[in-house]
């Protein structure tokens, strides 16, 4: 008998109510909130189902759980939609939110819907405009002209974290370098703290912490003074490898380094001024952009040798890291090696390993013994580094210095669909912050997206205003915040009254106890959120340093790809049909679901065909949450069959008891109870450690145990207890069918409000153990004996069991491995 999942899900969802007073909350569960693109995809399903299992389990443990949801609603796709479909970003976004809200509710997620908001709500972004004004007040926001990452497709600036392998994180376009006046947040103020405090995040994946550690990028080194030949000027060079100074053959500086003002050759000046900024190299493009440079004509004196070093302008040196100048030892740095080879510069080896190295092919970057280095000869690299620093300090030309790879966060975006920056520009007063009483600065709705460039700057009236200081004509800032600004504090907004921040509630609820989302946000959203907590604490909004206590990063949902003979992607159903028709089709590997590869499985179709519980259970089965999962049609069908068997087994059992009595039950019944409570204990432990796939396997095992008990007519009190336990432990995973079965077996109240079943610890104590009997190491038989059996009795039993094998042989010795094995060693009679 198949259960009507549509009727069950509709009936149950109407009855659920997960409202909670935030002041009573004891556990805060949050998934990374979605961008309202229009539809919930399978990646969302996995993310939100994991969070829902945790939230439902923690409620069952007796905690008041806060499990809110909102919408990360600003962003470029809304502008693209406005241009493509002639619809305003507001209308497009709200329509998508309505559809996705309906989808989320259909999954059966236990959200506190009364706390829902979208970041495009003016009452939400009013507060981040207020934050920005306070950041200005506390020296955490500033404006400057700087070299920025320009996305020529999206026509906007990107933060360093949004440039991946030299390309825009969203558009995929090759990023150019441009000089623009931008607003920045001073994340570097917290660089040391952000790095050091990673050690305290014991419940974060090590991989995420390592990614942040590398991104923050602490470099401990020294600044060395190089005298410029012919000029009374010193060039300061930062290095983490002072021990290679004897191998230096040139110096490289940034194209905008102040030392270049001393270049007198007109042609050289023109050449440097024409330096192509789009080819500048940072860590995100070190492997994709060719290294090149220009000989500036300037020369520096080597501080320890009677030789001069030419100074090159190089595209791999940036003014915003270190001092904007480096000395280069091509023999022991691959970047320097490539540059030296290109421009025929000397390559001097100063580190010698035991084996010979071929410096014609690549730099040697390993350890070894110093040579060709004067007073450093014969030293190890570590000793040489210390000695060189001591020497240079004694000469008065060196000081120790720490730099960070992390740069301040550029937050200006030349887009319409974002939060307006609350700044006014007055010719008389300069930069004037908007008064807090005049917030929020809202977006105009009559916007034209057909013109290129910044839509707000192109608006005929919006940017024109009066200076709040002098009353003169003035202009608004037409850039908007980077959308990561919104997602960097939303977890605190859920704690507030309205959409602001309630300090007392935030101090109580934060950090979020369980935060679930993709690892792709390790150095974007997660790092920015950590910064925001510190910045808002400095401004007095609350006293919280870390936003998330426990972080769970789920893998992707993948699906096979199908290609025709021309290499065009096919929809899976079309590919399978063509294969059946004998046509040429290549079945590719399973890849992340994407529209471009046509391997997307639509959630609405799955729920309509199999139900929400089937979708939830599939997405949590078989695979640990941190690993990728492959979508297979046969697996979702298998899950659906299990739910129907579960329904039939419980509905058909007509001996349900609600008050269990276990007096005078058989030994078999006791054994079954022990097994049931062992499985319950295993499921509980699996949930505590996020082993959701293991918990699923265990409750399916429990289903089989109950089925066997029913078949063998085991005491109905024992069976009833097992059924009640099963229904309760499956509820976090498959809440609709569980809630309905709870009603059918006579459960009181709503199942989602019932406590987790308690494990009877006495039933976990094994009264008997299985011991393997061996003769000369060969298996004879496994016997069940009391777990407190003494050795002499055990030996007697073993000898009796093995008598036939022993025969007339002599027993030489008997070895016992407690609770596991007894081995009888015999010798043949002469």
From Swiss-Prot:
<keyword id="KW-0648">Protein biosynthesis</keyword>
<dbReference type="InterPro" id="IPR013155">
    <property type="entry name" value="M/V/L/I-tRNA-synth_anticd-bd"/>
</dbReference>
<dbReference type="InterPro" id="IPR009080">
    <property type="entry name" value="tRNAsynth_Ia_anticodon-bd"/>
</dbReference>
<feature type="short sequence motif" description="'HIGH' region">
    <location>
        <begin position="34"/>
        <end position="44"/>
    </location>
</feature>
<dbReference type="Pfam" id="PF08264">
    <property type="entry name" value="Anticodon_1"/>
</dbReference>
<keyword id="KW-0547">Nucleotide-binding</keyword>
<dbReference type="InterPro" id="IPR025709">
    <property type="entry name" value="Leu_tRNA-synth_edit"/>
</dbReference>
<dbReference type="InterPro" id="IPR001412">
    <property type="entry name" value="aa-tRNA-synth_I_CS"/>
</dbReference>
<dbReference type="GO" id="GO:0005524">
    <property type="term" value="F:ATP binding"/>
</dbReference>
<dbReference type="Pfam" id="PF13603">
    <property type="entry name" value="tRNA-synt_1_2"/>
</dbReference>
<dbReference type="GO" id="GO:0005829">
    <property type="term" value="C:cytosol"/>
</dbReference>
<keyword id="KW-0963">Cytoplasm</keyword>
<keyword id="KW-0030">Aminoacyl-tRNA synthetase</keyword>
<dbReference type="GO" id="GO:0006429">
    <property type="term" value="P:leucyl-tRNA aminoacylation"/>
</dbReference>
<comment type="similarity">
    <text>Belongs to the class-I aminoacyl-tRNA synthetase family.</text>
</comment>
<feature type="binding site">
    <location>
        <position position="595"/>
    </location>
    <ligand>
        <name>ATP</name>
    </ligand>
</feature>
<feature type="short sequence motif" description="'KMSKS' region">
    <location>
        <begin position="592"/>
        <end position="596"/>
    </location>
</feature>
<dbReference type="Pfam" id="PF00133">
    <property type="entry name" value="tRNA-synt_1"/>
</dbReference>
<dbReference type="InterPro" id="IPR015413">
    <property type="entry name" value="Methionyl/Leucyl_tRNA_Synth"/>
</dbReference>
<dbReference type="InterPro" id="IPR002302">
    <property type="entry name" value="Leu-tRNA-ligase"/>
</dbReference>
<dbReference type="InterPro" id="IPR014729">
    <property type="entry name" value="Rossmann-like_a/b/a_fold"/>
</dbReference>
<keyword id="KW-0067">ATP-binding</keyword>
<protein>
    <recommendedName>
        <fullName>Leucine--tRNA ligase</fullName>
        <ecNumber>6.1.1.4</ecNumber>
    </recommendedName>
</protein>
<dbReference type="GO" id="GO:0004823">
    <property type="term" value="F:leucine-tRNA ligase activity"/>
</dbReference>
<dbReference type="Pfam" id="PF09334">
    <property type="entry name" value="tRNA-synt_1g"/>
</dbReference>
<dbReference type="InterPro" id="IPR002300">
    <property type="entry name" value="aa-tRNA-synth_Ia"/>
</dbReference>
<keyword id="KW-0436">Ligase</keyword>
<dbReference type="InterPro" id="IPR009008">
    <property type="entry name" value="Val/Leu/Ile-tRNA-synth_edit"/>
</dbReference>
<dbReference type="GO" id="GO:0002161">
    <property type="term" value="F:aminoacyl-tRNA deacylase activity"/>
</dbReference>
């Amino acid at each position: 008998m198949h259960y009507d999942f549509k009727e069950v899900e509709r009936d149950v969802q109407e009855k659920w109510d997960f409202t909670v007073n935030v002041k009573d909350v004891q556990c805060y569960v949050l998934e990374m909130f979605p961008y309202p693109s229009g539809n919930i995809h399978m990646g969302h399903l996995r993310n939100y189902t994991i969070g829902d299992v945790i939230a439902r389990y923690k409620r069952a443990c007796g905690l008041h759980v806060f499990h809110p949801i909102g919408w990360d609603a600003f962003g470029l796709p809304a502008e693209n939609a406005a241009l493509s479909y002639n619809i305003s970003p507001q209308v497009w976004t709200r329509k998508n939110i309505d559809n996705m809200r309906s989808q989320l509710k259909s999954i059966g997620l236990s959200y506190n819907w009364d706390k829902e908001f979208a970041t495009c709500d003016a009452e939400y972004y009013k507060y981040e405009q207020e934050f920005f004004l306070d950041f200005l007040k506390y020296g955490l926001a500033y404006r400057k002209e700087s070299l920025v990452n320009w996305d020529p497709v999206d026509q906007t600036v990107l933060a360093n974290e949004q440039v991946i392998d030299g390309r825009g994180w969203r558009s995929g376009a090759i990023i150019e370098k441009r000089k623009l006046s931008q607003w920045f947040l001073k994340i570097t103020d917290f660089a040391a703290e952000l790095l050091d405090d990673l050690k305290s995040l014991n419940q974060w994946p090590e991989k995420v912490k390592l990614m942040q550690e590398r991104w923050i990028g602490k470099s401990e080194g020294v600044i060395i003074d190089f005298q410029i030949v012919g000029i009374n000027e010193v060039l300061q060079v930062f290095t983490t490898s002072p021990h290679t100074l004897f191998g230096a053959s040139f110096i490289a500086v940034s194209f905008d380094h102040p030392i270049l003002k001393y270049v007198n050759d007109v042609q050289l000046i023109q050449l440097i001024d024409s330096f192509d900024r789009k080819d500048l190299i940072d860590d995100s493009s070190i492997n994709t952009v060719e290294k090149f440079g220009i000989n500036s004509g300037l020369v520096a004196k080597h501080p320890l040798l009677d030789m001069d070093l030419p100074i090159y302008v190089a595209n791999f040196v940036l003014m915003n890291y270190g001092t904007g100048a480096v000395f280069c030892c091509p023999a022991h740095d691959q970047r320097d090696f490539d540059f030296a080879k290109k421009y025929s510069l000397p390559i001097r080896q100063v580190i010698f390993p035991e084996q010979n190295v071929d410096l014609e092919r690549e730099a040697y970057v390993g350890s070894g013994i110093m040579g060709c280095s004067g007073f450093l000869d014969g030293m190890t690299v570590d000793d040489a580094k210390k000695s060189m620093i001591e020497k240079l300090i004694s000469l008065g030309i060196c000081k120790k210095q720490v730099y960070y790879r992390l740069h301040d966060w550029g937050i200006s975006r030349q887009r319409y669909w974002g939060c307006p920056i609350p700044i006014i520009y007055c010719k008389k007063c300069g930069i004037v912050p908007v008064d807090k009483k005049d917030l929020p600065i809202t977006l105009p709705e009559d916007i034209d997206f057909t013109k290129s460039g910044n839509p707000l700057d192109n608006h005929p009236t919006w940017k024109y205003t009066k200076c709040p200081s002098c009353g003169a004509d003035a202009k608004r800032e037409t850039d908007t915040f980077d959308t990561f600004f919104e997602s960097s504090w939303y977890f605190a907004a859920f704690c507030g009254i309205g959409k602001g921040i309630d300090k007392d509630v935030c101090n109580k609820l934060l950090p979020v106890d369980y935060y679930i989302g993709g690892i792709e946000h390790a150095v974007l959203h997660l790092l920015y959120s950590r910064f925001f907590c510190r910045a808002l604490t400095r401004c007095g909004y609350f006293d919280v340093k870390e936003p998330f206590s426990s972080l769970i990063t789920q893998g992707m949902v993948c699906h096979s790809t199908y290609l025709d003979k021309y290499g065009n992607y096919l929809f899976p159903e079309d590919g399978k049909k063509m294969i059946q028709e004998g046509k040429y089709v290549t079945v590719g590997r399973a890849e992340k679901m994407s529209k471009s590869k046509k391997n997307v499985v639509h959630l609405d179709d799955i729920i309509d065909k199999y139900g929400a519980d089937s979708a939830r259970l599939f997405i949590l089965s078989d695979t640990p949450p941190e690993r990728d999962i492959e979508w297979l049609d046969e697996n979702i069908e298998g899950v659906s069959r299990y739910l129907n068997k579960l329904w039939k087994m419980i509905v058909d059992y007509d001996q349900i008891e609600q008050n269990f009595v276990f007096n005078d039950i058989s030994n078999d019944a006791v054994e079954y109870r022990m097994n049931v409570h062992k499985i319950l204990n295993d499921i509980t432990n699996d949930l505590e450690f996020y082993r959701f796939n293991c918990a699923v396997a265990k409750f399916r095992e429990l289903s089989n145990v109950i089925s066997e008990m029913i078949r063998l007519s085991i005491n109905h009190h024992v069976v009833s207890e097992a059924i009640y336990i099963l229904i309760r432990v499956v509820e976090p995973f498959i809440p609709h069918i569980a809630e309905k079965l709870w009603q059918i077996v006579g459960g009181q109240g709503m199942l989602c409000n019932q406590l987790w079943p308690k494990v009877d610890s006495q039933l976990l104590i094994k009264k008997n153990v299985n011991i393997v009997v061996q003769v000369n190491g060969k298996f004879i038989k496994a016997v069940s004996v009391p777990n407190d059996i003494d050795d002499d009795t055990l030996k007697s039993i073993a000898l009796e069991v093995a008598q036939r094998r022993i025969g007339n042989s002599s027993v030489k010795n008997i070895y016992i491995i407690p609770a596991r094995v007894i081995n009888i060693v015999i010798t043949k009679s002469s």
